[in-house]
């Protein structure tokens, strides 16, 4: 099977780290071992600096980051990662497993922030072209459950400190996008861990069975 780009998405506390390990184990059981791991924003020297700027609550002092400036920083980090890490890895025949990609921007900025969705789609197409993940695994969790888990991890970043309404809008947009795109598979991440693990493994296995040899 040719190399593929698989992305794990979801609200804070959805369980993306655990899901990544389950994806890796499922791929390994199918004989796939050459993998590259990415996160967004981040994954390159430049992208990690942008990550600090956009997520660190102290990064800009008293200066509030404008919503459109935030979008552009996310895309700057994303383009750098795609062009210098993800595309070269895929060209080498490696599989890429990503913690977030463009769906996050469409959900968080388009849903949570309420930024014009046509503008976001136009910007995405301008900088990414037709580049898309082969599969996106969306871990659906309510904001109440997700934020409770996130708080248990420790100090929240700038995005994680947004209001419950922000995360409700973000989740609604995630669900809307997932319903419209067959390359996005949804897993109920509010279930007990063993049930989530079972569903993730089954989803990956089913998707792999659908792919050409």
From Swiss-Prot:
The yes or no answer to whether the keyword ATP-binding is present is yes
So which domain of life are we looking at?
Bacteria
Q: Which InterPro entries does the record match to this protein?
A: P-loop_NTPase, Thymidylate_kin-like_dom, Thymidylate_kin_CS, Thymidylate_kinase
Enzyme nomenclature, EC number: 2.7.4.9
Task: Indicate yes or no for the key word Nucleotide-binding.
Answer: yes
What one GO molecular function would you report for this record? ATP binding
List the catalysed reactions: dTMP + ATP = dTDP + ADP
Biological function: Phosphorylation of dTMP to form dTDP in both de novo and salvage pathways of dTTP synthesis.
Q: Which SUPFAM superfamilies match?
A: P-loop containing nucleoside triphosphate hydrolases
> Which protein are we looking at?
Thymidylate kinase
Q: Give the CC-aspect GO terms.
A: cytosol
Mind listing the GO biological process terms from this record?
Answer: dTDP biosynthetic process; dTTP biosynthetic process; dUDP biosynthetic process
Q: Return the similarity comment.
A: Belongs to the thymidylate kinase family.
PANTHER family (alphabetical)? THYMIDYLATE KINASE, UMP-CMP KINASE 2, MITOCHONDRIAL
